[in-house]
Amino acid sequence: MEIKELIAKATANMEKAVEYLDEQLSHVRAGKASPKLLDGIMVMYYGNATPLTQVASINTPDAKTIVVTPWERSLIKDIEKAIMDSPLGITPENNGELIRLGLPPLTEERRRQLVKQTKGDAEDAKVSVRNARRDAIDAIKKSVKTDGTPEDVAKDAEAEMQKVHDRYIKKIDELFAEKEKEIMTV
């Protein structure tokens, strides 16, 4: 594989790690209501586990409330059960037509737990970025031995890989700092 291809592949892997982290962080509750909080919830619909977003509309009338309106009233109990069984820790209020989720304010202890969780997610993303860098550098070194790539070209490629790595690590740190600030803001 050519050196440019190796760098492009490693960069793509690093980008995927950052995108995945961004997606993970968007599901972390930070004190205000967001329809994304319910993205991972699956509802039993005609015997199949179906994403909640495909069987109901989800709105946020204010910063502390999420309203789930099922497209079929018969699903309201199943949706309520799915929300109760989820790790969100929110008790749904069912009025027969829609479900209201009142988000209680986060306690200091819960905020710290969420920060710890997001820090772990950020660290996992950093590990993925480092692994992509290591794999690329190993492949570059291998190409010097087997393909006859010149040493100076390999050194330049390794330096380029390090720059790309540093850029993605910085992005991860920025995403984490932003989410930490959002979580800790009362």
Swiss-Prot record:
GO terms for molecular function: ribosomal large subunit binding. It comes from the Bacteria. Gene3D superfamilies: 3.30.1360.40, Ribosome-recycling factor. Keywords: Cytoplasm, Protein biosynthesis. Its main location: cytoplasm. One of its GO terms (biological process) is translational termination. One of its GO terms (cellular component) is cytoplasm. It is found in: Cytoplasm. SUPFAM superfamilies: Ribosome recycling factor, RRF. It holds the Pfam family RRF. InterPro entries: Ribosome_recyc_fac, Ribosome_recyc_fac_dom, RRF_sf. Belongs to the RRF family. Responsible for the release of ribosomes from messenger RNA at the termination of protein biosynthesis. May increase the efficiency of translation by recycling ribosomes from one round of translation to another. PANTHER family: MITOCHONDRIAL RIBOSOME RECYCLING FACTOR PSEUDO 1, RIBOSOME RECYCLING FACTOR. This is Ribosome-recycling factor. The gene is frr.
